[in-house]
């Protein structure tokens, strides 16, 4: 099947996940990038929120990094980046991606909003401490899992690691992984991959 793929992306954002997945899948794509694309009329036609990442694949729009990366992996089954639908490993993919988004990334994003995204008068600095505590609790769960496993699903690299790895790398940048040696080793493994965008 011939694929016509356009990726809407901008530097330090979740669009790194989509780019990494495209590269791992070996799929050719066009890039529309730069800060000027954010909230533009062109991007809003693809993602009504005007945010990246977003893709158009054979004329069909799709947004949200987890959806994009999962779909891309399904489009390149020969790469073995995701288990078949209906398998336990596919359920584990959904489990860990949902876990990272709800139990970790949501708190990192709240910290960002209340540190530099929102205007000063709208920031709630009291949230930072409780957000960090929630993130650290979730990180302790992954620390135990990765003490016994090199990767999150099926003992091999998968699109799950692209999505969760991005969140953990964000946490590392916020200095929240300093007491988690297994998470740090996991990130180093991911960064060894030639297509890694972390």
Model feature map: region roles:
Residues 100-189:
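GST-like fold's C-terminal all-alpha helical module
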Residues 45, 164, 192:
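Phosphate-coordinating loops and pocket residues in cytosolic domains that bind phosphorylated ligands
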Residues 1-126:
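GST-like domain detector, emphasizing the conserved glutathione-binding G-site
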Residues 55, 161, 193:
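Conserved G/P- and acidic residue-centered "switch" motifs that form tight phosphate/ATP-binding loops
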Residues 67, 182, 195:
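Residue-level recognition of oxygen-bearing side chains
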């Amino acid at each position: 099947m011939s694929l016509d793929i356009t990726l809407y992306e901008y530097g330090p954002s979740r669009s790194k996940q989509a780019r990494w997945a495209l590269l791992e899948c070996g799929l050719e794509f066009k890039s529309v990038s730069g800060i000027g694309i954010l909230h533009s009329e062109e991007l809003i036609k693809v993602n009504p929120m005007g945010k990246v990442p977003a893709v158009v694949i054979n004329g069909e729009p799709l947004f949200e990094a987890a959806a994009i990366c999962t779909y891309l992996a399904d489009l390149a089954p020969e790469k073995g980046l995701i288990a078949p639908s209906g398998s336990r490993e596919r359920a584990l993919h959904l489990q860990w991606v949902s876990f990272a988004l709800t139990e970790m990334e949501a708190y990192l994003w709240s910290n960002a909003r209340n540190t530099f995204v929102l205007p000063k008068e709208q920031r709630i600095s009291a949230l930072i401490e409780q957000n960090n505590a929630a993130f650290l609790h979730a990180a302790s769960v992954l620390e135990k899992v990765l003490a016994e496993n090199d990767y999150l699903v099926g003992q091999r690299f998968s699109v799950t690691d692209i999505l969760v790895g991005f969140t953990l790398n964000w946490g590392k940048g916020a200095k929240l992984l300093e007491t988690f040696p297994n998470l740090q080793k996991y990130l180093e493994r991911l960064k060894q991959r030639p297509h890694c965008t972390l």
